[in-house]
Amino acid sequence: MKLITIVGARPQFIKAAAVSRAFKEFFEIEEIIIHTGQHFDANMSDVFFEELHIPKPHYNLAINSLSHGAMTGRMMESIEAVILKEKPDYVLVYGDTNSTIAGALAAKKLHVKVVHVEAGLRSFNTKMPEEINRILTDRISDVLFCPTNEAVKNLNNEGFQNIDCQIIKNGDVMQDAALYYKDLAKKPS
């Protein structure tokens, strides 16, 4: 199976690293990582990726410092080009950023299945751009990985049990990452 992972914000790299480790340990998945550049930071150099055991992106789109609409639109165009080139079975997105919604929309429009990690989380404040991204990404996803029972409940309250998608309570991927890095920090340098 081939999967594209979309990341753009720093926390998404930490989450993606935890999931990538699980892919390598338990599954035969070819993972292609796209960094949209949403939160570009010169400090996220090779050392950052090496020290935190984060897989380096295969593609860096370098899209940042734009309005929400311009950023999301450019991300969709660039992600679409990679999807067409790589032909994945799934596109995996995390959380609620512009990278999340751009990846989900690009995949869905190309009839590629969308997997959303951290699905069902809600602030119930639709004035927040992140809340709009969460709701829309959940609506178009095929597989929804929820970190909590409350997240599953939110999806059920929104009628997701009547939508053709899979809802899975998987726990908090950030907790998995914290446990991994805690053990790593205990090792002598």
Regions found by a protein language model. Give the residues of each.
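Active-site donor-nucleotide binding/catalytic segment of nucleotide-sugar enzymes
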Residues: 2-22, 170-189
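Structural beta-sheet core signal
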Residues: 5, 33-35, 116, 169
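Cofactor-binding loop segments of dinucleotide-utilizing enzymes, especially the Rossmann-like FAD-
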Residues: 8-9, 36-38, 119, 172
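Conserved nucleotide-sugar phosphate-binding/catalytic loop shared by glycosyltransferases and other
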Residues: 29-71
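Acidic-histidine catalytic/liganding microenvironments
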Residues: 26
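Residues at the starts of beta-strands that form the adenosine-phosphate
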Residues: 2, 30-32, 113, 166
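Active-site and donor-binding regions of nucleotide-sugar-utilizing enzymes
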Residues: 4-6, 13-22, 48, 60-162
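A nucleotide-sugar donor-handling region in carbohydrate enzymes
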Residues: 39, 43, 140-189
